[in-house]
UniProtKB/Swiss-Prot annotation:
Source organism (scientific name): Arabidopsis thaliana
Purpose of the protein: Repressor of jasmonate responses. Interacts with and suppresses RHD6 and RSL1 transcription factor activities to negatively regulate jasmonate-stimulated root hair development.
Keywords from the named record: Jasmonic acid signaling pathway, Nucleus, Plant defense, Transcription, Transcription regulation, Ubl conjugation
Superkingdom of the source species: Eukaryota
Record InterPro entries: CCT_CS, TIFY/JAZ, Tify_dom
Post-translational modification: Ubiquitinated. Targeted for degradation by the SCF(COI1) E3 ubiquitin ligase-proteasome pathway during jasmonate signaling.
Record's protein name: Protein TIFY 6A
Motif (Jas): 259-284
Protein family membership: Belongs to the TIFY/JAZ family.
Residue ranges annotated as motif Nuclear localization signal: 261-268
Record GO biological process: jasmonic acid and ethylene-dependent systemic resistance; jasmonic acid mediated signaling pathway; response to cold
PROSITE patterns with a match to the protein in the record: TIFY
Induction: Up-regulated by wounding and herbivory.
Cellular component per GO, a single term: nucleus
Length: 310
């Protein structure tokens, strides 16, 4: 019984010693150690962990960095996770220990520096220099050749490399030149409308009413009774003078240069009017009849009464 117990104890003793050697290994302090066996078929196993104080320090630092940087774990890519821990296996296969190099802390520091503006004051951009570069100063030191532009008669003329003295001389010559005379605008000519000569309508001859003359002859008869007998004789006035007066009036009217057609129409109108006046007059007597009447009346007046002859 005791031998078996001692045998078990002797078997367990090297294991405890092996664990102590693993705990005292220097490379495994403060980090998680991954050990790989020399055999190909064997998988990775967790052998030992750091002390509780080291784990708490790492956890507090990680929590502080994550809270200040406000990083989301979902945004971390697969490549960044690969760069966190790089494992370099040792040369000796007997110890079966590995040296691990952690790249997590520099990454956290860089991320804290880059994302500091999320929790604190924003990072100022680098100042932009206002002063021009030396190349621009060199290029601007060479002045451009002066140009002379002249607008003349609707055309634009540009001359290169003109000295200021020449430009001033040209301007003085242009200013001292003869002043442009104002262009006299042609006067608008008045349109002359050739109108027909306005002539007064021909004055119509005055209508002569037939004059009726009454010839009264008083014959005193010396009779026994002493009775005087008045024998008034009414003679019809002659209208022959009216025709002569009308012809004289027509001759006195001014002759107007009218077309032949108007003259002919006017003559026809006057003839018809004269005929109407003559036909309408109630006492129409020819010249011959009027002369005979006058001679007869004169003879009657001059002759003595018939009863005196007896």
């Amino acid at each position: 019984m005791e031998r078996d117990f001692l045998g078990l104890g002797s078997k367990l003793s090297p294991i405890t010693v092996k664990e102590e050697t693993n705990e005292d290994s220097a490379p495994s302090r403060g980090m998680m150690d991954w050990s790989f066996s020399s055999k190909v078929g064997s998988g990775p196993q967790f052998l030992s962990f750091g002390t509780s104080q080291q784990e708490t320090r790492v956890n507090t630092v990680n929590d502080h960095l994550l809270s200040s940087a406000a990083m989301d774990q979902n945004q971390r890519t697969y490549f960044s996770s690969l760069q966190e821990d790089r494992v370099f296996p040792g040369s000796s296969q007997q110890d079966q220990t590995t040296i691990t190099v952690s790249m997590s802390e520099p990454n956290y520091i860089n991320s804290f520096i880059n994302h500091q503006h999320l929790g604190g004051s924003p990072i100022m951009a680098p100042p932009v220099s206002v002063f021009p570069a030396p190349t621009t100063i060199r290029s601007s030191s060479k002045p451009l050749p002066p140009q002379l532009t002249i607008f003349y008669a609707g055309s634009v003329l540009v001359y290169q490399d003109i000295a200021p003295e020449k430009a001033q001389a040209i301007m003085l010559l242009a200013g001292n030149g003869p002043h442009a005379k104002p262009v006299s605008q042609p006067k608008p000519q008045k349109l002359v409308h050739h109108s027909l000569p306005t002539t007064d309508p021909p004055t119509m001859p005055p209508s002569f009413l037939p004059s009726i003359s009454y010839i009264v002859s008083e014959t005193r008869s010396s009779g026994s009774n002493g009775v005087t007998g008045l024998g008034p004789t009414k003679t019809k006035a002659s209208l022959a003078s009216t025709r002569n007066n009308q012809t004289a009036a027509f001759s006195m009217a001014p002759t107007v240069g009218l077309p032949q057609t108007r003259k002919a129409s006017l003559a026809r109108f006057l003839e018809k009017r004269k005929e109407r006046v003559i036909n309408v007059s109630p006492y129409y007597v020819d010249n011959k009849s009027s002369i005979d009447c006058r001679t007869l009346m004169s003879e009657c007046v001059s002759c003595p009464p018939a009863h005196h002859l007896h």
